[in-house]
Amino acid sequence: MSACSDFVEHIWKPGSCKNCFCLRSDHQLTAGHPKARASSLPAGARLPARPEICRLEDEGVNGLAYSKPTIAVKPTMMTSETADLWTEASLSAEVPKVNWRRTPGKLLLQKQEDGPIVYLGSFRGMQKAAGPLACTDSNSRCPPAYTMVGLHNLEARVDRNTALQPVNFQEEKAGREELPSAQESFRQKLAAFTGMTSSCLKGPRPCTSPQPLRESLPSEDDSDQRCSPSGDSEGGEYCSILDCRPESRDAVHNTEGSGRRRGDCSPICWEQGTCTRPTEEEKQALNFPRECCGQGSTANPPHLGPKKPSLNSEAASSSDGLSCGSSRSGANSPFAPHLENDYCSLVKEPTSVKQQDSGCHLVNSGKYVGQAVDLQPPALPREAVQPEPIYAESAKRKKAAPVPQRPEPKKEQVSSGQVWTGDTWSQKTPSGWSQEREGPNAAPQVATTITVIAAHPEEDHRTIYLSSPDSAVGVQWPRGSLNQDLHGSGEEPLVVQGLSSRESHPHNMTENSSKEKPAIPPKLSKSSPGGSPVSPAAPPLTDHSDGNTSGSSVGSQPSSRVPTNLTSSCQTNGVAAGDPAKCPPQANSSVLDQRRPRYQTGAWSRQCRIEEEEEVGQELLSQSWGRELENGIADHSNSSTWHRLHPIDGASGQNGKTNSGMSKSASFAFEFPKDRGRLESFSPPPPPPKSRHLLKMNKSSSDLEKVSQSSAESLSPSFRGAHVSFTTGSTDSLASDSRTCSDGGPSCEATHSPTISGKKLFAPVPFPSGSTEDVSPSGPAQPPPLPQKKIVSRAASSPDGFFWTQGSPKPRTASPKLNLSHSETNVCAHDEPPLSYSLNSGNHPHHVFSSSEPLEKAFKGSVPWAPALGPANSKGGCGSPNLQGRAATSTSSSQLSVSSQASTGSSQLQLHSLLSSISSKEGTYAKLGGLYTQSLARLVTKCEDLFMGGLKTELRFDENSWSLFKLICNKPCCDSGDAIYYGATCSKDPDSIYAVKICKTPEPKSASYCSPSVPVHFNIQQDCGHFVASVPSSMLAFPDTSSKDPAPAAPSHTPAQEQDCVVVITREVPHQTASDFVRDSVASHRAEPEVYERRVCFLLLQLCNGLEHLKEHGIIHRDLCLENLLLVHCNPQSSPGPSANPSVPTTTSRCPSAAPAATTACQGGPGEKHLPRLIISNFLKAKQKPGGTTNLQQKKSQARLAPEIVSASQYRKFDEFQTGILIYELLHQPNPFEVRAQLRERDYRREDLPPLPTLSLYSPGLQQLAHLLLEADPIKRIRIGEAKRVLQCLLWGPRRELVEQPCPSEEVLCNTLHNWIDMKRALMMMKFAEKAVERRRGVELEDWLCCQYLASAEPGALLQSLKLLQLL
């Protein structure tokens, strides 16, 4: 860029500088002093998103030879800040930031012509090699000619003239691994690479100046650098677009689509898509050329040679995300020069580069499987709109570059892009890479990254807008056949091998691509415009870590890991092998992805079309990628947050390995490279593409977002043909799923593609119904079924997504393959198991029978998971009910279908389970007992909802709310020991009745009133707010007078006087206290002792329930007396509403005139139709055990308390004791300690306590319970929980007759009690069934209490209770 200072619109001719349009040879003349380019744009002009675009250019897009692209230069300053973030620069200031990023699919191979060309572009998302090269894998992912990519500006320290020598990546790997640090290796790489860059910057034209390399290496924005690396190694910030061959529109689109879906192309698409959504052709052309260039560089051993040692570091870093040795390295290395030089040297060795490009493409394709990102760029947006221009932005990172040149954005129209013909890209433009060098400024400048956005990959004729901060952005569109390029390069054989291997292993390619792509979709990482470094880094890392990439990038060796046949890969992904366009982009994607990750991370989403974004997204967002990665690349992308590194590990791993990264939870969008050394330069994964990329994606931004969110539902059809199956929600399963669901469809082959096998670690659990797993497109261009999102019932889908995602790696490998359309069938199959398991799964761990789950859920099918459960899961499902449910949900195609199938399938399954041992009485009875237990447990919950109604929600009122209340009657409804209660309504909630509790105690004392800080309970008074208010004296005086006389004069006495009192708002409106109840029921006790005493037992049971709840929270009431126990009308009907309505009249009836009626009802205690609800009130004396406070001072004070005080031993059984006294008082007996004062002065025995008259069968039990509670020794005193169980035994049995047997053994008694419990449960269910069909009989409080008892009863506890009652 520095070489040219002015940009004007020209017709660019092959061989001329794309920035200044002068002969590139002129720029090349001075390697060390690149000609100043047209004035470079200010840094600000660089678009953050452009870095990705720049990346495309970095990737070395070659214009097709036959067409003369017009370049519209648009001054822009691209900032790849995101890339910088991702770039980990341990290098000195000279080497500002070098991201060694190997894109997973990148082939290191360069065209022979381009062999000398080394594109060193830092790759976004690629961190500096951490330790050994990313390609350190045994697989020669990074071919020997492994150029350092992302070594922009590394060359700043190195003479531009230094020629980059292709380095054997494996060799480098060994050497680099030895390097103590990635930085050191990186520096070595930079040095070597800069040398190599100058030498190999241009395949055909030697890189005159290594300085561009340096620039490219240090370029601030790796992703930008990645783009710019396409420039010569010389100091131009020349963005060389190598072998930019837009495939035939169809081919490109197919490639894109297939690549995106397949993953072969998608890496390329990913990269390019990341940057922009150029036509797929363009993507492929742009990205592939990049790769080619990189490969070309690699192909030229002289270039890489110097870098060999550094290449190892590169490999390491590329594994981190830098595609050093990969085709990206090769292709990228040319970019690197561009980055460094900002040079327009589209170093394209017409034959070698292109051939390498082809080779790269092929290899990349295979590699892409390993390195989804790289492959992606070639696979331009598979459905880019042809009419839309391609926007290529070149962003130059100038960290170390002393001269901050700002390349002007250029627009280059490529009449036609590279076309993938069969296995190779045919470049429509034969012209070789124009290797224009910018002036000396280029060297200091950081390599610019060119992002090419192809709106319509299908369009052969594209307008490429190159926006390069460095005015020197060279873009050539040499159009040579991919084969030509492949064969032309000395490394062509390698490329061919890689390609062939891909072709031979198309599935592997696809897998690799998928993995690669997901690794770092630049667009996906919206958060980082320049963040593409991360995403590229991840894909390269993935590829490198997988080792597939290295082979792909450098030669056949890596490609062997990758599927040999791109076509096959495409096929695997749902694209027919015959769809060469799709397959080739895969190869290109490798290369491009390697570069692209740089910009993909950050800027790709901006201008990129959704399709291209999808490609990018495929890596990060499997969904959007899924569309483009119909090959199954989407699998990786399926996790909304593709592990960019995952794709590298997992994506390339998909081919030959399981994706370790993918195996991580899908929720973790970014997976670190397998090699921590690679991670050395690895930057944190870019945040999942969010607003920016997603927003950018016109079609599937929401889809991508959903994918990134790991949405259980499949992405919207916006991803055409992208049926990303997020099998497990884990990246590993994602890859499998995407392939499985490619095309959202039945194409199980795709799902079973090697990608899946690679991910077999986590067998993908497909969400047939459109779970996120389904999002990844396996089909090349087929939009996912529109209903895909909806296919999963919402209930099912949310649980599915979660269940499957969290649930289990145990993937139904077949299921991922299932189309969403098949989901219903699957659901049915799964539905039965869910039912059988549904009973088990519930909240109860009953595994007695599969139907242990709630019948209601199982039969209703309301539980999405129930249908999801498979027959296999029904029994085993007990262990993992959630998983089963999720699986079922995902399988369900629609909520309706799920629920209906759940009801049928579940019921059938449950029935099958229940009838499995129908021949055995014991087995049948055991299952029936379990069913009743589960049913009662559900009934308890339902009754709680019925009786509690809306009481569970806490309300808070303050003094400002006092004016909102209006008394229903001027007479109190209840006078308790501590307060007077009035019924009132609230203007904010006129339908509800509240009680206004006016405390009798003086204001200062009651001001400290506070209700216990415990959860709402049916038997604890709920404090909805208390405050001090001025209350008329008449309201306080009336109760006393009214209790004795009407005293009508009392109100008139002080009508105007007011008194400050503590006012408490409660929801429970009491009609009387227990004291009133006892006083009014003396006659009824004599008349109907059994009825009355039974009611006393119910009141005591409610008291024990409330006290037990308080004790669970460490609260001791300490003031249990009849006056503090309030009775509230409780006669619920079929719904909570009726219970509320009665309270209104009741409250109104509390008016003086109606008081007698209420009293009469209460008086007849036993005669009262409905059992009253007991409320514990007045907590003024309550104590809470110390230790729960968070106040430091209080903790210090408590630390000095004696053990008996801390443990509150004196209060431990305080409430139990007072409960014993209440038994006497409720049975109309005086407090024994009042009658016999001597009992308080000495230790007493049970015999000393006064006896209770035996009036009913409950009397002996109540007396025994009172004695147990009044034990003088607190240690011998029973606890409130035991008292509760004794009361339950008294109320519902078992009776003495049941256990009166001659010397029965305890085991026999337990068996007897177990059978008794089962029988009582069956009778209770029958009672509920009868009440359900009786209009006037609703569930009563007694029924709820009985259900509580029977649901929790067990023989051991019953035996203990019987012993306490002395019935045994």
Swiss-Prot record:
Q: Which residues carry this modification: Phosphotyrosine?
A: Y238, Y343, Y391
Would you tell me the Gene Ontology cellular component terms?
Answer: cytoplasm; focal adhesion; nucleus
Q: Where is this region: Disordered?
A: 200-236, 297-330, 392-443, 499-605, 636-792, 799-818, 873-901, 1134-1166
Residues spanning the signal sequence: none
> Required for homodimerization: where is this region?
906-949, 1293-1368
- Whether Cytoplasm counts among this entry's keywords is yes
Give the primary localization class.
cytoplasm
Outcome reported for the amino acid change (mutating K997A)? Does not affect PRAG1-CSK complex formation. Does not affect PRAG1-induced protein tyrosine phosphorylation
Q: Which InterPro entries match?
A: Kinase-like_dom_sf, MitoQC_Scaffold_Kinases, Prot_kinase_dom, Tyr_kinase_AS
The record's account of how the chain is modified after translation: Phosphorylated by CSK on Tyr-238, Tyr-343, and Tyr-391; Tyr-391 is a primary site of phosphorylation.
Q: Which SUPFAM superfamilies match?
A: Protein kinase-like (PK-like) (SSF56112)
Listed GO molecular functions? identical protein binding; protein kinase activity
Describe, from its UniProt entry, the tissues in which this protein is expressed: Highly-expressed in brain, including cortical and hippocampal pyramidal neurons, as well as in kidney, spleen, colon and small intestine.
One GO biological-process annotation of the entry reads: regulation of Notch signaling pathway
Give residue ranges for domain Protein kinase.
940-1291
Keyword annotations for this protein? Cell junction, Cytoplasm, Nucleus, Phosphoprotein
| Pfam families, sorted | Pkinase
- Effect after changing D978N: No ATP-binding activity
Residues annotated as carrying Phosphoserine in the record are: S667, S716, S753, S797
* Domain free text: The dimerization region encompasses helices both from the N- and C-terminal of the protein kinase domain.
Question: How the protein assembles, per its UniProt entry?
Answer: Homodimer. Dimerization leads to the catalytic activation of CSK. Interacts (via C-terminus) with RND2. Interacts with CSK (via SH2 domain) in a Tyr-391 phosphorylation-dependent manner; this interaction potentiates kinase activity of CSK. Interacts with NOTCH1 intracellular domain (N1ICD). Forms a complex with N1ICD and MAML1, in a MAML1-dependent manner.
Q: What does this protein do?
A: Catalytically inactive protein kinase that acts as a scaffold protein. Functions as an effector of the small GTPase RND2, which stimulates RhoA activity and inhibits NGF-induced neurite outgrowth. Promotes Src family kinase (SFK) signallig by regulating the subcellular localization of CSK, a negative regulator of these kinases, leading to the regulation of cell morphology and motility by a CSK-dependent mechanism. Acts as a critical coactivator of Notch signaling.
Protein name in the entry: Inactive tyrosine-protein kinase PRAG1
Q: Which organism is it from?
A: Rattus norvegicus
Name of the encoding gene: Prag1
